[in-house]
Design a protein with these regions (language model features):
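Long, low-complexity segments enriched in small/aliphatic residues
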Residues: 1-57
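Long, contiguous, secondary-structure-rich segments that constitute the structural scaffold
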Residues: 49, 54-68, 72-155
């Protein structure tokens, strides 16, 4: 769907308008302390999902799964660059290294895809296990991979 500029809470599709069923689907989770948005995606090149994460060059550059966190949020959590953190959603959790960077929004945490639990060098639980398979876009049926509510704590 396409976001409509005049009705920001609706997605427009030729011939129909889809309105979210619940205007505040995350209110309950926010009340439970899930105050950050988990964004997942591809890490920077040359690491490309399972094709390259076994290469020694990628292992040198990114030996561990990381979570990018804004410096202001990191300070409020008493985190320093390189600390081990737990990123938790209502569906699971992972452990990663904190990468403190001003290149991310204050209320977000970025965790890359492509690290799996069967890696020979640094086994981690995949971030995909943390997604809510029931929370789907009403038009495309795509699962929510970009704004899943989470909380971050020091491991």
């Amino acid at each position: 769907g396409i976001m409509t500029p005049f009705h920001p809470n609706t997605l427009g599709v030729p011939g129909r308008i889809v309105t979210p069923k619940d205007e505040t689907p995350g209110a309950k989770l926010r009340a439970e302390g899930y105050d950050m948005e988990l964004v997942t995606g591809r890490p920077p090149a040359p690491h490309f999902h399972s094709w390259t994460h076994y290469f020694w060059q990628s292992q040198e550059m990114w030996p561990d799964l990381y979570a990018q966190i804004h410096p202001d949020k990191a300070a409020s959590l008493s985190l320093e660059d390189g600390d081990r953190v737990i990123v938790k959603t209502s569906h699971g959790s992972i452990e990663a290294r904190a990468w403190i960077t001003p290149g991310i929004r204050k209320g977000a945490v970025f965790v890359p895809i492509g690290w799996g639990e069967k890696q020979p060098y640094h086994p981690w639980r995949s971030v995909n296990f943390m997604t809510d398979k029931t929370q789907r876009d009403p038009i495309s049926e795509q699962t929510n991979l970009k704004t899943l509510l989470c909380r971050v704590t020091k491991a």
